[in-house]
Amino acid sequence: MAPQEATTHQDERTLTVERVQIGVRMEKRMLKVLKGLAEYLDITLGDLLEGITLHAFESQTPFNEETRRRIAQLKDVYGMDYGAEASHRFVELTTGTAKDVGRGENR
């Protein structure tokens, strides 16, 4: 796979990176909010996830107040009625069994 160039926002120099295709499972409503936010920001879902991750790694908030208001609207639209407090508490129902998704343990 050929490396893709990404422009850094701090100093406008380019940083050559190699991106890979991944397959991940996410909570459905959260994914809808993320896709809606990426569309609103006119960036790809991958770029959004990279930005969120880089900010989280440095204990920085990735969004300004206006974007947080948009996120709240998208959460309402898509019925995402939980927040960070739900982290590691998701239970996935699959063919009649419950699986603790947050920690990968079976219940």
Where are each of the predicted segments found?
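Short, basic amphipathic alpha-helical segments that act as recognition/interaction helices
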Residues: 41-68
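Charge-rich, solvent-exposed alpha-helical interaction surfaces
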Residues: 33, 70-73, 89, 93
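N-terminal low-complexity, intrinsically disordered patches enriched in charged
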Residues: 32, 51, 76-77, 88
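Short, contiguous, helix-prone interaction/anchoring segments in small proteins
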Residues: 22-43, 47
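Short interaction-prone segments
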Residues: 65-81
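Intrinsically disordered, low-complexity regions of eukaryotic proteins
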Residues: 13-14, 29, 52
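Short Lys/Arg-rich basic patches
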Residues: 1-25, 38, 76-85, 92-107
